[in-house]
């Protein structure tokens, strides 16, 4: 699994290396916020600026799309709920601790015995991702991340259409929504 992959296993092998990675993640997050704020003043209301903001957003998002989950363990719960449903266990009656290996998936133990708060469509999609992942959590994680990224893209498209209809600066809206560090770190990473 992902935890046994050499770079991850190496950095998890020592508390000092884990702390170093945590500090680098925090510094990287701050640098991303600073880059996003500094990027703002150069945005004009024209198609070239819009393309530049979208291109920059994609460049910033790509590494986050393939990195291990950061800042939240929720995505591990999504995978576990999908596995629960795929195993034929009602997630509205049972917690993910009903499936073998739930803890090794990365689910927060605090939520392990809690019934699912997610709607039926979400759970059905999570079950499909679990099935497509063929029991390999990393595949299901990536499929969940792709779905979240697709949702973020649809959100950006919708906001850009609204901005165009209202006569607003679409490049500014793209900066606020697509390039925003919250969108990148919470929807994609």
Q: Language model features by range: what are they?
A:
Residues 188-189:
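Short acidic/glycine- and proline-prone juxtamembrane loop motifs at membrane-interface regions
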Residues 47-55, 159-180:
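Transmembrane-helix signature of polytopic, membrane-embedded enzymes
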Residues 122, 172-173, 184-185:
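Internal amphipathic alpha-helical segments of the cytochrome P450 catalytic fold
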């Amino acid at each position: 699994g992902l935890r046994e992959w050499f770079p991850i296993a190496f950095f998890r092998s020592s508390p000092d290396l884990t702390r170093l990675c945590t500090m680098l993640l925090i510094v990287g997050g701050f640098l991303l916020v600073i880059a996003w704020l500094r990027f703002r003043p150069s945005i004009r209301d024209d198609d070239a600026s819009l393309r530049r903001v979208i291109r920059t957003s994609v460049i910033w998002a790509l590494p986050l799309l393939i990195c291990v989950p950061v800042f939240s363990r929720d995505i591990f719960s999504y995978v576990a709920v999908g596995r629960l449903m795929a195993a034929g266990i009602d997630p509205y009656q049972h917690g993910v601790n009903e499936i073998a290996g739930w803890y090794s998936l990365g689910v927060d133990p605090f939520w392990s015995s809690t019934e699912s708060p997610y709607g039926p469509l979400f759970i059905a999609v999570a079950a499909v991702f679990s099935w497509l992942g063929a029991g390999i959590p990393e595949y299901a994680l990536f499929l969940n991340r792709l779905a979240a990224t697709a949702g973020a893209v649809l959100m950006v498209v919708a906001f850009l259409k609204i901005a165009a209809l209202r006569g607003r600066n679409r490049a500014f809206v793209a900066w606020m929504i697509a390039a925003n560090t919250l969108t990148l770190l919470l929807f994609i990473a």
